[in-house]
């Protein structure tokens, strides 16, 4: 990958990782329009690491408070709202871990196509619109509970299907369960930490096992670009949804799905 390709794809990944619009749907477009080949494991390591660092940096105070409360709850047995939230995040991660280890190969083989990505982009865009329209109660993330956390975790596991969008699926589920828009987004972002950490570790292992020559310059550039893009994305996404809701992202998903359908049928 040349420098231009690294920058463009890292920008796309960083900007779309935390928006409910599907990063896989966007990464397929450069391949279709410019004939770019698969990005390779080095790029996957870079963008996973950059996105993880961005969400950890943005929510550093919340994560530190949660981690401190969680470790204290293990030692003392006493639960606070921060420790409960930590346990719910852990619970919500389990479905994605199970599906990821048991069905990743099957999903990559049978669902990683432009037809599937186009369909899921549109279908889950409509579900996001419906969930946002129906959202009424406005719970915060400290009121989730283990049942809601598990349902949101199942939605995250479904997002392993390309085009679904991890943040889109989890935010949709959270809205359906009565969380406010901001709380749904924050819970989704916090959920991304263990998932992104696990993905970064697994992809790094795959890279080391593959024996590929590592392009450290491209790796470093990808981390920096995806970190900056993801950090900015998180900040402005939270501001946008508090004022405009999910409608802009629904419209965008439907338009993107239409473009992908154009590649299929034209």
UniProtKB/Swiss-Prot annotation:
How does the record say this protein sits in the membrane?
A: Multi-pass membrane protein
Q: Which residue ranges run through the membrane?
A: 1-21, 39-59, 87-107, 111-131, 144-164, 183-203, 218-238, 246-266
Name of the protein this chain belongs to: Undecaprenyl-diphosphatase
* Record keywords, A-Z: Antibiotic resistance, Cell inner membrane, Cell membrane, Cell shape, Cell wall biogenesis/degradation, Hydrolase, Membrane, Peptidoglycan synthesis, Transmembrane, Transmembrane helix
Q: Does the keyword Cell wall biogenesis/degradation apply?
A: yes
Where in or outside the cell it occurs: the entry states: Cell inner membrane
Per its UniProt record, what Pfam families does this chain match? BacA
Function noted in UniProt: Catalyzes the dephosphorylation of undecaprenyl diphosphate (UPP). Confers resistance to bacitracin.
The reaction(s) annotated as catalysed by this protein in its Swiss-Prot or TrEMBL entry are: di-trans,octa-cis-undecaprenyl diphosphate + H2O = di-trans,octa-cis-undecaprenyl phosphate + phosphate + H(+)
Per the record, the similarity remark reads: Belongs to the UppP family.
């Amino acid at each position: 990958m040349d420098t231009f390709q690294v920058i463009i794809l890292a920008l796309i990944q960083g900007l779309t990782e935390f928006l409910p619009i599907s990063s896989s749907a966007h990464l397929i477009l450069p391949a279709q329009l410019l004939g770019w080949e698969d990005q390779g494991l080095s790029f996957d390591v870079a963008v996973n690491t950059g996105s993880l660092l961005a969400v950890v940096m943005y929510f550093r105070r919340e994560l530190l408070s949660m981690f401190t409360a969680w470790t204290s709850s293990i030692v003392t047995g006493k639960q606070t709202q921060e420790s409960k939230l930590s346990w719910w995040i852990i619970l919500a991660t389990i479905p994605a871990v199970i599906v990821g280890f048991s069905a990743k190969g099957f999903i990559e083989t049978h669902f990683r196509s432009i037809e599937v990505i186009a369909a899921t982009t549109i279908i889950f865009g409509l579900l996001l619109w419906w969930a946002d329209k129906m959202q009424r109660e406005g719970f915060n993330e400290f009121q989730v509970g283990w049942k809601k956390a598990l349902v949101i975790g199942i939605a995250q596991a479904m997002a392993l299907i390309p085009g679904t969008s991890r943040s889109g699926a989890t935010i949709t589920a959270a809205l359906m369960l009565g969380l406010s828009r901001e709380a749904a987004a924050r819970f989704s972002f916090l959920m991304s930490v263990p998932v992104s950490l696990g993905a970064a570790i697994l992809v790094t292992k795959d890279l080391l096992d593959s024996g590929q020559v590592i392009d450290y310059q491209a790796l470093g550039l990808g981390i920096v670009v995806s970190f900056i893009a993801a950090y900015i994305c998180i900040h402005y996404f939270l501001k946008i949804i508090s004022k405009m809701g999910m409608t802009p992202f629904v419209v965008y998903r439907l338009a993107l799905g239409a473009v992908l359908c154009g590649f299929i049928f034209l």
